[in-house]
Amino acid sequence: MKIPEEEFLAPGHRGCAGCGATVGVRLALKVLGKNTVAVSSTGCLEVITTPYPETAWRIPWIHVAFENAAAVASGVERALKAKGRDDVNVVAFAGDGGTADIGLQALSGAMERGHNIIYICYDNEAYMNTGIQRSASTPYGASTTTSPHGKESFGEDRPKKNMPLIMAAHGVPYVATASISYPEDFMEKVRKAKETDGPAYIHLHQPCTTGWGFDPAKTVELGRLAVETGSWILYEIEDGDFRVTYRPVQRKPVEEYLNAQKRFRHLTEEQKARIQEYVDSVCQELRI
């Protein structure tokens, strides 16, 4: 795939060095183009790209509350439809907290109503903007400020909420998982979402150097390691048909992924083995 050179997210924003969210937004907007309206919930992306009076966005952009990105995007879509404008893409960007927790009700409603919008969840697996608190998307065993490891706790004790399958259960015509570390796979999925008649949901996995604890130069490498170990699986569901879009030639041990991050370094060998067993069971079910 030839990646367009034009940028719709300007450099000079205030993202952390190695920020994965901005990589994802840049790639998505290269596919969607200038005829796009973006809606962004409160979160990392909003804070780093629009410190008043500055903005890094080169397209129309709307900042909304933590919980209602999907609702506002659906309103924008209906307004454009009323004006006879079918040439404008409407995309919502929200983090995992604004998607799996606070914004789930609005997202569910927008998907169920069938609005012609694209919703991209940039998942860094915690509330990174407000202090690295756990979310429903925080993986089992991860240490956060509200699920810390210590004498009484080993970190997050709940499994990661499966948002893509929840969206698929709504009958959404296009649902996909993606990773910033596999840009062509992600951009192809954005293209399919753009061409979908109806709502589309993409769950984008993006390493967070601040919250996960790793070298900022290793963001893309760590994202690849998540996929190569089976900790994050790339797939799409088109009109109910499930397809894995990338299969590692030989899966690496999950321990390689866990050991590369500070948030998992407290885990015992027994706990790591338990995580490996879970990953193995999921991969076996999907024949990866």
From Swiss-Prot:
Biased composition (Polar residues): 137-148
Subunit field text: Heterotetramer of one alpha, one beta, one delta and one gamma chain.
SUPFAM superfamilies to which the protein is assigned, alphabetical: Thiamin diphosphate-binding fold (THDP-binding)
Keywords from the named record: 4Fe-4S, Iron, Iron-sulfur, Metal-binding, Oxidoreductase
Protein name listed in UniProt: Pyruvate synthase subunit PorB
Region Disordered, annotated ranges: 137-159
Cofactor (UniProt): [4Fe-4S] cluster
Pfam families documented for this protein: TPP_enzyme_C
Organism: Methanothermobacter thermautotrophicus (strain ATCC 29096 / DSM 1053 / JCM 10044 / NBRC 100330 / Delta H) (Methanobacterium thermoautotrophicum)
Top EC category: oxidoreductase
Gene designation: porB
Positions contributing to [4Fe-4S] cluster binding: C16, C19, C44, C208
Membrane-spanning ranges: none
Cofactor, free-text remark: Binds 1 [4Fe-4S] cluster per subunit.
